[in-house]
From Swiss-Prot:
One of its GO terms (biological process) is base-excision repair. HAMAP family: 3MGH. InterPro entries: Formyl_transferase-like_C_sf, MPG, MPG_sf. This is Putative 3-methyladenine DNA glycosylase. Its EC number is 3.2.2.-. GO terms for molecular function: alkylbase DNA N-glycosylase activity; DNA binding. Belongs to the DNA glycosylase MPG family. The keyword DNA damage applies. The keyword DNA repair applies. CDD domains: AAG. It comes from the Bacteria. Keywords: DNA damage, DNA repair, Hydrolase.
Length: 201
């Protein structure tokens, strides 16, 4: 039995997957990161979603299948890691916003040019840099051993929630939706002042 998260784990609504990814581990060679903060980009109603205007060469990995990598460049320098969710043909994903280092700290710091906490891994571009990712990782299956993997972690009972970051272009109902989730009482979380205990319906 493996602790790799299987494809069916990702084949659900992005918000469900986002909540269940908190506490899971991102692993690449000797680097292991615990996921502490995520953002859900849902389908089809989310106007912050990269697929809102249809499929393009840049966002093509976003359309599936689930459980694969969607990476894109932000400001031409930061590689932002997204995990594709939902059914194939739906442009949905979870952005990994922040992580806690578990193993490989020396290599992480070299890749991050000597940065130390708390700014080492609190931001999506920082996560991509710590893992040494580039656009060649697009489409990579996260559920297969080797390369970049996502492994089960200890479930997180209570979550923080708040609006996503940097989506001023979205409709107000999506811009303000509490689709950014994080682990409470963890220093490896960004923009903490905008987060509140998540209310379960």
């Amino acid at each position: 039995m493996t602790d790799l998260l299987p494809p069916r784990f990702y084949a659900r609504d992005a918000l469900e997957v986002a909540a269940d990814l908190l506490g899971a581990s991102l692993c690449r060679e000797q680097v292991v990161l615990r996921i502490t903060e995520v953002e859900a980009y849902r389908w089809p109603e989310d106007t912050a979603n990269h697929g809102r205007h249809g499929q393009t060469l840049r966002n093509e990995p976003l359309w599936g299948p689930p459980g694969r990598v969607y990476l894109y460049l932000c400001y031409g320098i930061h590689h932002l890691l997204n995990l594709v969710t939902g059914e194939e043909g739906q442009a949905a994903a979870v952005l990994i916003r922040a992580c806690e280092p578990v193993a490989g700290l020396d290599l992480i710091q070299r890749r991050r040019r000597g940065k130390i906490k708390p700014g080492l891994l609190t931001g999506p571009g920082k996560v991509g840099a710590a893992l040494g990712l580039d656009l060649s990782w697009n489409h990579h299956p996260l559920y297969e051993p080797g390369g970049l993997e996502v492994r089960r972690g200890t479930p997180v009972a209570a979550l923080l929630a708040g609006p996503r970051v940097g989506i001023a272009y979205a409709h107000p109902e999506h811009r303000d939706a509490p689709w950014r989730l994080a682990i409470p009482d963890n220093p490896w979380v960004s923009c903490r002042s905008q987060l509140q205990p998540r209310q379960q319906n």
